[in-house]
């Protein structure tokens, strides 16, 4: 399998660093919206710095893998394994941080297309690095298995493929190697091969765990887009509901205004009718009385 290093391309973060430098050197005194965007870009710059650091760490992991596959002394091998474990631990810590930071950036850019583009750019870079890390681990897993198989066939040259595979997958190896250990002339070789195969087996278990975590992380980062869209849909629904409430409120208000106008008109009509009745009473009752009195 190919050992090609997926990190030999140019640094993909230079463009963002240049953009951030321009923003940091821009004159002050902008509006609150501009200040907010600069603060957001500072956050993006921090994410890109951690992405670059993450890339460097998995480069080191790739280099450690290659060194472990070469002929090294037992002391060198132990040192390489300690160093490899440290790099893997650093990568794991950064993965959690990057996931949280990118999710936070996406949340901040929920209603700003420029911010959304920057956050999405970081997410895509992270996805690529995760995929590259998975390829590195997958290559090392296959090469480690092949090396362990070669070590086993040194002491069991007539072993079938099934027997070799069983030896690689047996964590203890005692039963698999018992026949070889019975051969006094090859006892030392068998013990050395047993130790190597056991070490490779433990390494393969760690690799499988790391690869499972990377697969889960990759899926989580892909689902961030779905989650982000769901948040947008919820907000849009809330805005739509609020708009409907406003429209309904305006409708109720208009109805109340119309009712009030109608009530005022009815009141005026009643007053006019009362005035007419009063006038009729005056004409019919009061006026004749006054005329009669004068006579």
From Swiss-Prot:
Keywords from the named record: Coiled coil, Membrane, Phosphoprotein, Transmembrane, Transmembrane helix
Q: Does the keyword Coiled coil apply?
A: yes
Which positions carry Phosphoserine? Answer: 31, 34
Single GO cellular component term: Golgi membrane
Hey, which stretches end up on the Cytoplasmic side? 1-269
- Chief location: membrane
Give start-end ranges for the coiled-coil region(s): 39-100
**What range(s) does the t-SNARE coiled-coil homology domain occupy?**
194-256
The Gene Ontology biological process terms listed for this entry are: ascospore-type prospore assembly; exocytosis; Golgi to plasma membrane transport; Golgi vesicle fusion to target membrane; intracellular protein transport; vesicle docking; vesicle fusion; vesicle fusion to plasma membrane
Entry's transmembrane regions: 270-291
Database matches in PROSITE patterns:
SYNTAXIN, T_SNARE
GO MF, one term, reads: SNARE binding
Pfam annotation, one family: SNARE
Q: Return the Gene3D superfamilies for the record.
A: 1.20.58.70
Tell me where on the tree of life, at the top rank, the source sits.
Eukaryota
Q: How does it sit in the membrane?
A: Single-pass type IV membrane protein
Q: Does the keyword Secreted apply?
A: no
Record's miscellaneous remark: Present with 1720 molecules/cell in log phase SD medium.
| Family the entry assigns | Belongs to the syntaxin family.
The record's function comment reads: Required for vesicle fusion with the plasma membrane.
Name this polypeptide is given? Protein SSO2
Q: Which gene encodes it?
A: SSO2
């Amino acid at each position: 399998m190919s050992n090609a290093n997926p990190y030999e391309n140019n640094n993909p973060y230079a463009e963002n660093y240049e953009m951030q430098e321009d923003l940091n050197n821009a004159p002050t005194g902008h509006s609150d919206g501009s200040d907010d965007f600069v603060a957001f870009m500072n956050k993006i710059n921090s994410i890109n710095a951690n992405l670059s650091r993450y890339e460097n760490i998995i480069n080191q992991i790739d280099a450690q893998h290659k060194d472990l596959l070469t002929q090294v002394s037992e002391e060198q091998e132990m040192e390489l394994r300690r160093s490899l474990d440290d790099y893997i631990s650093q990568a794991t810590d950064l993965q959690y941080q990057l996931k949280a930071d990118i999710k936070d950036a996406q949340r901040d850019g929920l209603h700003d297309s420029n911010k959304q583009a920057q956050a999405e750019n970081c997410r895509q870079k992270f996805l690529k690095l995760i995929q590259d890390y998975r390829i590195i681990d997958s290559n090392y897993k296959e090469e480690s298995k092949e090396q362990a198989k070669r070590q086993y066939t040194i002491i069991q040259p007539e072993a079938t493929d099934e027997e070799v595979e069983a030896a690689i997958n047996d964590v203890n190896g005692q039963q698999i190697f018992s026949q070889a250990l019975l051969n006094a002339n090859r006892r030392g070789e068998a013990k050395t091969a047993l130790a190597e195969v056991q070490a490779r087996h433990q390494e393969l278990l760690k690799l499988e765990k790391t690869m499972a975590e990377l697969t889960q992380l990759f899926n989580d980062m892909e689902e961030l887009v779905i989650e982000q869209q769901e948040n947008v849909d919820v907000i849009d629904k809330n805005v739509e509901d609020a708009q409907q409430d406003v429209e309904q409120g305006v409708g109720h208000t208009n109805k109340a205004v119309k009712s009030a106008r109608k009530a005022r008109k009815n009141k005026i009509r009643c007053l006019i009718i009362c005035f007419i009745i009063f006038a009729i009473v005056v004409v019919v009752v009061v006026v004749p009385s006054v005329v009669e009195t004068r006579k």
